[in-house]
Amino acid sequence: MKVYAPATIANFGPGFDVFGLAIETPRDTVIAKESDDFRIEVEGYKVPENDENVALVAAKALFKLVGEEGGIYLKLKKGIRPKSGLGSSGASSIAGAVAAARILGVEDDEIIIRAALEGERKASGSPHGDNVVPSYYGNFTIVESLNPLRVHNIEVDFKVVVILPSVEVPTSEARKVLPKKVPLKDAVKNIALASSLVLALKEGNLEEVGRLLEDHLALPYRLSLVPWFPKVKEAAKEAGAYGVMISGSGPAVFALGENLKEIGKAMKEAFESFGIEAEYWVTKVGRGAKWC
């Protein structure tokens, strides 16, 4: 059995730990079969091939949640670069959880998500759902609550340009720099931005969505980890981008607009001015985890 889980853009501007967007490219793939124990092999980007692997952690968690014994063999084709800001651990966790669910005949979304969150906990230290939820459901997702699971899904149809520089930002490190408290005016601003962004998405107003891609809760405190972002954003805007933002905790950046290839080229040149190599691609919105 084979499971595909797409990369994701977490936060999507003002929706810290709440908003997420699945993208079609890249993705992780898991080939799974029943086994007497829990084992994993990995192809592609280098990640652990033992109990530290988040796909295996998620698969084990699902077995435990439903009270099943036994095991599973996973072959993970790692297509999403770790520490990229594109939900690498979230996609692997969803792939592992879905694989275990299909083998055991589990169809309960909440159990699958809860198992995948254990993979995210392993990777980043906290079970945040803004990567695993869109990777599972696809489209644009809003995580209202994880316990109980309350998720809202908005079907959207547009393309984004994503650029990934040759630097890493571990999610665990990016979360450490965040303050315990933020100014009330910043919280109010993000609520206004997030509410307006959801409305713009529902109306299909991509230019307005781009304008609302701001963040006053996390990005100001993370700029020390992504010091090149203001210049990359400026280059994208000059090339015609509606909006530009860090994907997740970075370093990946995404932009909305019409001339996406030109925007990607402009961002690449901006990265190169810092001596940083980067690759960009244009992708559609992803439709969630799939299996066959």
Curated annotation (Swiss-Prot):
Top EC group: transferase
Molecular function terms from GO: ATP binding; homoserine kinase activity
UniProt-listed Enzyme Commission number(s): 2.7.1.39
Associated pathway: Amino-acid biosynthesis; L-threonine biosynthesis; L-threonine from L-aspartate: step 4/5
Keyword 4Fe-4S: no
Protein origin, superkingdom: Archaea
Record protein name field: Homoserine kinase
Gene name of this polypeptide: thrB
